[in-house]
């Protein structure tokens, strides 16, 4: 099993929790983490707000699975809804969950160590690896195919 707690440390964790906490203080508060990753921030949000629920969105199915396992181990799975999607699909995600309002939205934009350190994903320039660079590996279009088939104007 991958020790995800040591793969990616959430950036500015205490500051993020302190910023989100006031919005999540009331009963039935709903938070959305639009870039769930390995759930470091989300676990802290749910621990700080025991009455809140959280929808975790990520387009990386591997990260989503690992985050879900972490939530289960932390005893937070009953207040966590994992969703495989991109953050620009937030409106649809909320509609699918019959949620009309949220109290807090969080985004930690960029790559995580999970993507960079996994050589075969092709995000690191430090290793000779396939030029994949897909955040969602279920999608067929790789960086290699783009570079091989797109003309300069498309790039």
Question: Where are the language model's segments positioned?
Answer:
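S-adenosyl-L-methionine-dependent methyltransferase catalytic core, i.e., the SAM/SAH-binding region
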Residues: 1-155
